[in-house]
Structures are given as C-alpha cells and as structure tokens.
Amino acid sequence: MNYKLLGKILGKIMILEGILMMAPLAISIIYKEYNKNVYSLGGVKNILAFAIPIVLLFIIGFALQFTKPQRKSLYQKEGFALVAMVWIVMTLFGAIPFVINRDIPNYIDACFEIMSGFTTTGASIIDDITLMSHSTLFWRSFSHWIGGMGILVFVLIFIPESKDGSAMHLLRAESPGPQVGKIVSKMRATARILYLIYLGMTVILASILMIGPLIDTNAALQATGIDYSGDKVFHALITAFGCAGTGGFGSIPNSLQYFTPFAQYTVSIALLLFGINFTMYYLILIGKIKDVFRSEEIKTYFSIIIAAVGLIFISLKLGGIIDSFAITQNYDTTEEAFRHSLFQVASILTTAGFSSTDYDVWPVLSKMVLVICMLMGAMAGSTAGGIKTSRIVIAVKGSYINIRKLINPRYVPKAKFEGKLLEEKTINDVFAFITMYAGVFVLAMLIISFDPVNGTTVIINSDAGAGREVTHGFFSNFSAVASCMSNIGPGFEAVGPYASFSGYNWFSTIILTLTMLIGRLEILPVFILFSPRTWKKI
C-alpha cells in the first residue's frame, strides 16, 4: 500500500473539509448565535463548534502534506480503499460540531446524522428540528450538496493528471452505477464539467425557490406555533442543497408538508432532473440531444416514473374500493392527490426522502410501489442512490439471456444496452452487485432485529391525525435498512416520514451508519477497506 500518498490525499480532503466548514461557521455568525444563552459557555459554543474542528482539520491536513511518497500513482485497490477512508474521516470530523454545540450530544448519533448528510440519505435521529441552531441545520444540509456529486470528484479537479489511471480508480469507486467513464479525454476536465453542471442546476433551483412562494406560513404557524415568514433565503438554500444531492434534510418540521404547492411541484421536478445521469446534460450542452432521446436508461427511468405515479394516484382515488386498509389520509381535490403522488415518487425514486404528506397511512398498493422505488433508485451517474435503473435493465436482459440459453444451448446472445452489445462480464458484475446488496441488506436486518426497540410503540403526529400509535416491528426494520442502504431517509411505520431513527440503540445506530456508507459507495470500496488482504504486503 502506498501509505504516504494515501495520507497526502487524505490530508487534502481534510483541508477541504475545514474550508467547507467555514460556511456553517459564517451562518452561525450571521444569525448571531454567539449571543444565545445556551449552556455554560453561552452561544460561544455555536462558534467553537465549527472553529475547533476547522483548526484540527487544518493542522492534521497540512502536516500530512509534508509526506513524500516514492510512488505517485494508486493501484485500483488503493483507490477504492482511499475512497472509503475519505468518507469515514469526513464523517468523524463532520460530527464534532453537533457534539460541541450540544444539538446532538451523543457522538455516535452525531456520526449517524452527518453520515446521513454526506451520503445524501436524509435519515435523522433528531426528534424536534425546531431546537436545532441555524448553523447545525445548514451544515447537515450542506453536507448533502458536498456528498451528492462526490467528495473525491471535486478533488480530482486539483489532482494532477496521471497516465496510470489513478484518477479513474477514484472516480469509479465513488461514482454510482455500473458504468463510469470520461465524458472528455481528461479526468480533470470531466470533473470540472460535472461540477459546473451540478453547481449551475443548484443555483437555478435555489433562485426559483427564492423568487416563488416557498412556505405556507399560515399553515406552518397554526401547526407548529413558529412564524416562518422570514428567512426565505435560508430555507430556499437548505431545500436546494437537499434536492441537488437528493438528500432529504429539511429546515422546518414535517419536511416539506408546509411548503406551497408551487414549491412542492418545483421540488418534484428538480428531484427528477437530479436523478438523471449528468452525462445527459453534457450531451445536451454540446448539441447531441438525439443521443439523449435514444438513451435506453432514460426511457426506462421516465417509464417507471409515469407507471409509479399512475398507480399511486389511482390507489389514492380508489383506495376504499381496491384496499380494505382504513385510509386516514384524505385529499380534497384530484390535484392534491396527484401532487402528493408525483412528489413522493420523485422523492423516493431519486432517494431524496423529502415528504409532503404522511404516506405511511396510504393504501397498501401505494406503499408497495414506494418500496419498489426505494430499492430501484434513479439513473447511474446521478446523485441518487439505490440499485440504479441501468442495473435493473441489465439484470432483466441478463436473466432473459440465461433463460434462452437453457432452452437452446446454441443461442448466441445479442442483447444490447445503450446501443452496445452486453458483455457477459457486465451482466455478471450486475448480478454480483445485486447479490452483495441483498446479502448486506439481510445481515443488517438480522442485526437490528435484536434491538430492544422492537415491539415498542411510537406515537406519530402527522397531517393524517395526531397521536397515531405505531408498533416498531418487521416493516419498520425492513424500511430502515432499505432507506439507509438506498440512501433515502425516512421509511415506514416507526421510522416513517413523521418519525425518526432515535429509538435504535448505539449498536444498531452504528450498523445503520455503516449501511449508509456501503450503499453510497456501492459496497466494494468498504469491503476492500476492511479486507485484511488489502493491507498485506505482496
């Protein structure tokens, strides 16, 4: 292992995290959180919460720059291990502010929260978001934006181009999906293009949210007793960060329930756009629009969206006829039912995890559609999690090929994906990924099934009615693992859209934190990092 080079790159990441932490530090100063009388040091804790880790990151990061590696290249296993190390280090330091300012005093819970942010999961252990400081709300949502495109993708802009493929190893390890490649000849140029598109879309979305009506302040005031008529820029930024990274952390109670219909439609469309492979936007920019319309994955992606929205909309309108489940959520108009159907499909399929309503009380058919969307995810090369649309398409075609071979051993596969013949290796890689995905999923479920929280009752207060009792059981654990593995956020029942993950004990919290990392980095980098063979001298 090239320890010195790993340390040097890790040091660059730590310096970068320290620089990024200056943003929530600025928010703390802007909102004068140092004037707040909180705990023994008063509001100074909100300043120290970010100042202390910034100093630590700079000291360690710059110290690591003095190492002189003999080899300036990375092998594939080193690149994959480095990516996992980077995300773990970012989390360990990123959790410190929550502990210092006492917003999340338990360090394990704080690591869960910030890992949920960096991996764009959006699962939270916070029960009452109104008690959080502005700087905490900003940092955890800003982490969505940081992790959405990928931490190392950003660093690739500054790492010198190498001829040995080191940069490609890092990009492959961090970018979601079965196929990763350059969109232009040089990796640094590819990284710049990706981030410029990402930044541009974020700025456009934030501007639209700032200009249009954002929060229904009367409804929010009546339900929460808090006046949200001010701070529109802050709430628009928080929402834009969550959409861009397809995260899910919000800035007011009950996610986006109290947002205006305009804002909910805007977020729905934005999420679907951020769930598209960013290569498609590059093709549009260079005038190759026909190639976008020929994409098999994008056709499948929008077909799934239309089918899912249609099924949920019909289920909501005809719930009493097709489902004996007692629906406690009623929508006054057809438009409202359609809006919530579109919003939740967009949010769950792109693994954002925002909620506009309590979908946990929807008919069984609607909930099953959302569970399927949870596992599938959006397109490869997007900021979304899940298995990915491309893998689903390849798996279906691979299964068809295997069935044809069983019927006719002389059958020669001619299946294509995106205009290219599907190689047997690609199909096998997809099947291997799905097998590992299922294995981790089942193992995580078994572990958290020992948690004492199972069998307890949780009280849910939502727009479907206050004081609804939910038992923490199998479906709660299933959806908790699914939401963490697919980087979605809320699940169903005791971890539903109006609940949190705070009921789990420390060990289950650690398991779910690792599950989020495994899901975001798509298994292999984490497995390679913890494999003893990786660290043996050859």
For the regions a protein language model found, what residue spans apply to each?
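Membrane-proximal intracellular helices of multi-pass ion channels
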Residues: 1-538
